[in-house]
């Protein structure tokens, strides 16, 4: 995904306000061996790009002054109540160095699972993203979590995710192995089931 930005020479609150009034958003590019670079971007184009999941989790081709560099979106600052992006941070990516970043989780097949079909359980998504480490070329846009076999009362953990080749959970996620999805039967459904049972004669 390509992003076009422009070099920013003015700094400070006043300069940022003038840029916002002109339909621009301030940003910074940092990391790698190069010095941090102040940039400005078209606000409307950035606003629409931020609505795309891939913009948050993929390697981006950032073009500044005709030169392209690979980056990851690292931070976005929004206005408290206006539909306004105040500032963005991008981190340069080294093709030879592993990066740590969060990848979205896409949950599939819950509707055909035993938990839902046999027990009328509710499958809850406890996490929507997971932190992984890999080389930039191996970074997945998202990870799929197959829920087709989950049963009522069961949970799916981070280590249950099928990871692509070259991708691993970060050390702390691997150690904690957090729950990412669970299947529970609503309290009302349990009560109804109990009331429906008749004692044996």
Swiss-Prot record:
It holds the Pfam family Ribosomal_L25p. InterPro entries: Rbsml_bL25/Gln-tRNA_synth_N, Ribosomal_bL25/Gln-tRNA_synth, Ribosomal_bL25_b-dom, Ribosomal_bL25_C, Ribosomal_bL25_long, Ribosomal_bL25_short, Ribosomal_L25_dom, Ribosomal_uL5_bac-type. One of its GO terms (biological process) is translation. The keyword Nuclease does not apply. The keyword Oxidoreductase does not apply. Keywords: Ribonucleoprotein, Ribosomal protein, RNA-binding, rRNA-binding. Signal peptide: none annotated. It comes from the Bacteria. Part of the 50S ribosomal subunit; part of the 5S rRNA/L5/L18/L25 subcomplex. Contacts the 5S rRNA. Binds to the 5S rRNA independently of L5 and L18. This is one of the proteins that binds to the 5S RNA in the ribosome where it forms part of the central protuberance. This is Large ribosomal subunit protein bL25. It comes from Burkholderia multivorans (strain ATCC 17616 / 249). The lineage of its organism: Bacteria, Pseudomonadati, Pseudomonadota, Betaproteobacteria, Burkholderiales.
């Amino acid at each position: 995904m390509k992003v076009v930005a422009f070099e920013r020479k003015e700094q400070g609150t006043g300069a940022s306000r003038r840029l916002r009034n002109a339909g621009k958003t301030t940003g910074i590019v940092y990391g790698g061996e190069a010095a941090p670079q102040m940039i400005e971007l078209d606000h409307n184009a950035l606003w629409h790009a931020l609505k795309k999941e891939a913009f948050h989790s993929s390697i981006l081709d950032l073009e500044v002054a005709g030169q392209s560099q690979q980056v990851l979106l690292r931070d976005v600052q929004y206005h408290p109540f206006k539909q306004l992006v105040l500032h963005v941070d991008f981190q340069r990516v080294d093709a030879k160095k592993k990066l740590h970043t969060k990848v979205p989780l896409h949950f599939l097949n819950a509707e055909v699972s035993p938990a839902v079909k046999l027990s009328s359980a509710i499958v809850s998504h406890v996490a929507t993203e997971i932190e992984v480490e890999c080389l930039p070329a191996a970074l997945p846009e998202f990870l799929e979590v197959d829920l087709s076999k989950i049963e009522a009362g069961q949970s799916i953990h981070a280590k249950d995710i099928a990871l692509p080749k070259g991708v691993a959970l970060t050390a702390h996620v691997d150690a904690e192995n957090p729950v990412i999805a669970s299947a529970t039967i609503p309290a009302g459904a349990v009560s109804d089931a109990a009331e429906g049972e008749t004692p044996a004669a």
